[in-house]
UniProtKB/Swiss-Prot annotation:
Classification lineage: Eukaryota, Metazoa, Chordata, Craniata, Vertebrata
Domain of life: Eukaryota
Cellular component, GO annotation: extracellular region
S-S bonds: C3-C22, C17-C39, C41-C52, C53-C59
Location in the cell: Secreted
Gene3D superfamilies: CD59
One MF annotation (Gene Ontology) recorded for this entry: toxin activity
Protein name: Fasciculin-1
Length: 61
């Protein structure tokens, strides 16, 4: 699966992931900034909302 991968300070690049899922991590509270994207599906918490997706490629835009 092709996923976008970056942190808050890096430019987004496309990564070919071994996992079948991508994630997009963002703040739950305003300002709702996107804090990173990448491979897999890490858990969220009270501050971070993690949206995971499995298809199509680049689904974590």
């Amino acid at each position: 699966t092709m996923c976008y991968s970056h942190t808050t300070t890096s430019r987004a690049i496309l990564t070919n992931c071994g996992e079948n899922s991508c994630y997009r991590k963002s703040r739950r509270h305003p300002p709702k900034m996107v804090l990173g994207r990448g491979c897999g599906c890490p858990p969220g918490d009270d501050y971070l909302e993690v949206k995971c997706c499995t298809s199509p490629d680049k689904c974590n835009y």
